[in-house]
């Protein structure tokens, strides 16, 4: 039986949910409070100079792969154009109702009553079988509670409201916090400000946005199927050594900004166990003295003077808080403080599959769109009755196991409570969906085997089989992508694996069975 489903938000996750649910024939209505699709990428919502920190291959949906023949980091405008093509190709926009804000979603028996408010203020109610929340993380800006901040007389904004660096021309500016957008914003402001200070509580792990495949281990450590499994099976004590191998070539570099990056990476701890900022743009202005970092945090404010925990102080005219966002679902009665309290970070066990949260998982590597797409594929199967959620007890058991795993794996940055390992999470969801790719033998399909094991874990591999497969086009994409690993390494691995299997077969137990 086909369901009537309400989707809240037409951002990257909402678009994925529309596509996967309509693939199963469900009737979908997506309410978007803005006048256009794209969420944070909507026109006028973010600064124009934005470039993605995730490559085109991990920001594109598996059923509409990039047309470029090489790795690229799309600009905001380029990504919006990709989304436009996606919506047009699958006729998705007919399901979106713009300028309509969901003000309340309430469960009544086995139905949901959704109240929406139009741009003119008119309110209407509709009934649905399911509600899918795709409103995203970026709803309620978070700012720290700092002593004396209320007495500061200068300008205070959150990165959510940043549009143009010229607003800070000639001013003494302090940026607080570091993420991908903060690296861009701080760098831009430093070009025009009289002084630009960057306040951080601790040294962050920062990886380059642009990199050569063969030269930078950040590309393969956790995005390759093979290396992900090898690295994550090692004891945590080995991970610092792996990180050292990454930064040692930078700390000895003649290039000052590379040397600074290496020093920060060294001081931040194993990058495998924390959120990583994938944007090194900041290190050039730091090396040039345009950005002055203060590591340790803010003690208090006295008027327009900021006093840091290391005892130093600075006079400033403006503050830009790049300090993230709070979870916010004002239209729901359910209170959610941490997404790790949900089954697969999607479902509230006590509510079941009629309420889903899509796109609230943050992969340490890889992009949110492909994860939201995988979540939506599972949701679509649940809606169609092809799959069903585990028992309440089993869901709670999985929630606890997953939470313990992610808290241990990313213990250096516990405040990023939605962080997951891309490869592990995608595989776990693929098993639920039934689209986990089977690695072929060397005899059956040697080229595909090499690409699956040794190249990044592209979303296309989850279209080789399972519901709504695109076997031929997915295989073509995978086998035509250049090798990340070298052929000598690949051959060495395959020989070692074959030897291991041979030795296992020739074990004493097997020999005894053969003698019988």
Curated annotation (Swiss-Prot):
This is 4-hydroxybenzoate brominase (decarboxylating). InterPro entries: FAD/NAD-bd_sf, Flavin_mOase, Flavin_mOase-like, FMO-like. The keyword Oxidoreductase applies. It comes from the Bacteria. It catalyses: 2 bromide + 4-hydroxybenzoate + 2 NADPH + 2 O2 + 5 H(+) = 2,4-dibromophenol + CO2 + 2 NADP(+) + 4 H2O; bromide + 4-hydroxybenzoate + NADPH + O2 + 2 H(+) = 3-bromo-4-hydroxybenzoate + NADP(+) + 2 H2O; 3-bromo-4-hydroxybenzoate + bromide + NADPH + O2 + 3 H(+) = 2,4-dibromophenol + CO2 + NADP(+) + 2 H2O; 3,4-dihydroxybenzoate + 2 bromide + 2 NADPH + 2 O2 + 5 H(+) = 3,5-dibromobenzene-1,2-diol + CO2 + 2 NADP(+) + 4 H2O. It comes from Marinomonas mediterranea (strain ATCC 700492 / JCM 21426 / NBRC 103028 / MMB-1). FAD binds at residues 13, 32, 40-41, 51, 102, 365. The keyword NADP applies. Coiled coil: none annotated. GO terms for molecular function: flavin adenine dinucleotide binding; N,N-dimethylaniline monooxygenase activity; NADP binding. Belongs to the FMO family. The lineage of its organism: Bacteria, Pseudomonadati, Pseudomonadota, Gammaproteobacteria, Oceanospirillales. Its cofactor is FAD. Brominase involved in the biosynthesis of polybrominated aromatic organic compounds. Catalyzes the bromination of 4-hydroxybenzoate (4-HBA) to 3-bromo-4-hydroxybenzoate, followed by bromination and decarboxylation of 3-bromo-4-hydroxybenzoate to 2,4-dibromophenol. Can also use 3,4-dihydroxybenzoate, with lower efficiency, forming 3-bromo-4,5-dihydroxybenzoate and 3,5-dibromobenzene-1,2-diol. Keywords: FAD, Flavoprotein, NADP, Oxidoreductase. Its EC number is 1.14.19.55.
